[in-house]
Swiss-Prot record:
Domain notes: May contain a beta-propeller domain involved in specific binding to phosphatidylinositol 3,5-bisphosphate (PIP2), leading to the association of the protein to the membrane.
Xref: Pfam families: PROPPIN
Keywords of this entry: Cytoplasmic vesicle, Membrane, Protein transport, Repeat, Transport, Vacuole, WD repeat
Bilayer topology annotation: Peripheral membrane protein
Location in or out of the cell: Vacuole membrane; Cytoplasmic vesicle membrane
Biological process according to GO: autophagy of mitochondrion; glycophagy; nucleophagy; pexophagy; protein localization to phagophore assembly site; protein transport
Record function comment: Involved in mitochondrial or peroxisomal functions and amino acid signaling pathways.
Protein name in the entry: SVP1-like protein 2
Annotated TM spans: none
WD repeat intervals: 186-225, 231-270
Amino acid sequence: MRTPDAHVIASMEDQPILNAAFNQDSACFAICHNRGFRVYVTDPMDLRVQREFDDGGIGVIQMLHRTNYLAVVGGGSNPKFPQNKLVIWDDLKSKPALSLEFLSPVLNVLLSRTKIVVVLQNKVHVYAFSSPPSRISTTDTADNPHGIAAFSGDTVVFPSRTPGQIQVVDLSQEGQARNLVSIIRAHKSPVRCVTLSADGSVVASCSDNGTLVRLHSTSNTALLHEFRRGLDRAVVYNMAFSPSGSRLAVLSDKNTMHVFDTSASASGAAGAANRRHVLGKVPLLPSYFSGEWSFVSARVQGQHGVLGWSSETSVVVVWISEARWEKYVIVEKKPVEGSGKDQPGCELVREAWRAFKDL
């Protein structure tokens, strides 16, 4: 679809972003607001679809790859659809293709070509993507007001009924036939954020303490890595694996984005690029001196954003609170003469940014 010329695109100053989500490979992302939604190519940022409604806003949105189908839920000051109703929107026909209604608000939606995952505050429903949708399963969860869940490949993860634990469900044909469900005892306090690698083999999670990020295998629940984001309590808003799964970006309310090297095996040495505290090997010191720290980080000017990788070295942030797109790249530092051989090898720098209102 042709991108409208810049001078005819309406300003978003009077329609702040309500939510944003990358598609399954982060090649595109969608934002929703008080009058509709937009779809962009991620990098370079390019507007592809703009839909505005006269009768209300969209509060939750999820793309299905690059198809004409999007999952939407009403939101904002005047929701277009009831907030307990999930609509599969056919943008080619500009009308709903499917809908599902629930007894409580829909907080999150995850899609594949064959499944629809609907997240409520205390339940997760899985449906076959068919007309009409047929329900595959319903699972009770711990209180989940942020709609925390992740879906990749045939694997879906979400908080279990016990705070701090993560439920892993295999949605493959074999997994459904054998009812393959695993529980990961990930944290002592409630889970605040989860994400999956592209193949669904690794889940990254953090609790509402926001100090540690743990990586577990979804096949056997083994702990693969423990990363330290920081020492102070923080709210981790979003995490995302790079396309190969060898790096993990973490965004928190501390105005910092961290990137961890996840390439080392659990049985081997820690990721070569990650740092360790200088006191990490001193006996009898608190555990927060141990563990791996990010190998690059950057100060960011934003609070609530979502992450997507456009390449192995490029991370894009869509800031919901600031209505801004930013691109950060991992680059090699230039050697400083006379500084010795052990200079840091990489840094995370902001390469580009654009405000949505300026399009």
